């Protein structure tokens, strides 16, 4: 009898502790291109607050659909406005918490040891000739933000028709980066921040402003979030400390930092 009583008491203590534990944790679903910078920012947040952050990185399209299917996330950071709009339209995020946090740039990369040096990217840019018999690594142009930006730029510059069949499409921008880093493709189109963290690639050209929509990373708390710490986390992302971290990795900080 006493054994059963102690077992029941132990279970009650575990259940009572569960909400408290949840208060000390935040689950973040973030675009793959944010990994290095956000990992560092999250570590600083945890050190300052004691709140554990668990981050999952993937294509924004995949993350939005996972949240829609019930995946437990407190914060969503997309690499474009469309997938955050999708989340808002499906009532997956709290609109009053949404802000455009970061910006980025689109660049052309090659393996570090490639003979290709610099390329002037502009109207009439012949990317197909540059690739030769090789392929061009990009994220999925139909769904993944980095791929959609790449397609928009290539269409604007008149290069899309010549390269569409030569694209090696990847599940996210970091996978496209890896194709070039491993030498599997001679060229790739990624964000400038991705190129900066991979020593096996180099930037050979930058796509001109106006050839693709501004790369924007909106952030919002999810509708189903039950973490009281989520609001503190969102506030931290707007802080001078977070701004310094993101800018160190090459992101543009789009909002005024809040101390």
What does each of the following model-derived ranges do?
Residues 18-22:
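Sec/Tat signal peptide C-region and signal peptidase I cleavage site
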Residues 4-17:
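Bacterial N-terminal signal peptides
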Residues 23-71, 78-81, 85-259:
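Exported/periplasmic ABC-transporter solute-binding proteins
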């Amino acid at each position: 009898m006493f054994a059963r009583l102690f077992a029941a008491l132990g279970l009650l203590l575990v259940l009572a502790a569960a909400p408290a534990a949840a208060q000390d944790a935040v689950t973040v679903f973030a675009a793959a291109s944010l990994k290095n910078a956000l990992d560092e920012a999250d570590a600083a947040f945890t050190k300052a607050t004691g709140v554990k952050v668990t981050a999952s990185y993937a294509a924004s399209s995949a993350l939005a659909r996972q949240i829609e299917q019930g995946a437990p996330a407190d914060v969503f950071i997309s690499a474009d406005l469309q997938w955050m709009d999708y989340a808002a339209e499906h009532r997956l995020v709290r609109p009053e918490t949404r802000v455009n946090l970061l910006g980025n740039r689109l660049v052309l990369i090659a393996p570090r040891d490639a003979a290709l040096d610099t390329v002037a990217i502009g109207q009439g840019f012949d990317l197909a000739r540059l690739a030769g018999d090789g392929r061009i690594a990009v994220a999925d142009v139909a769904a993944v933000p980095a791929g959609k930006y790449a397609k928009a730029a290539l269409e604007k510059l008149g290069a899309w028709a010549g390269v569409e069949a030569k694209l090696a499409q990847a599940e996210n921008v970091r996978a496209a980066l890896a194709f070039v880093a491993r030498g599997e493709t001679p060229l790739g189109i990624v964000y400038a921040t991705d190129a900066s963290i991979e020593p096996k690639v180099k930037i050979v050209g930058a796509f001109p402003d106006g050839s693709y929509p501004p790369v924007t990373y909106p952030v919002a708390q999810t509708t189903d979030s039950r973490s009281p710490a989520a609001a503190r986390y969102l506030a931290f992302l707007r802080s001078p400390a977070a701004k310094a971290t993101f800018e160190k990795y090459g992101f543009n900080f789009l909002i005024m930092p809040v101390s």
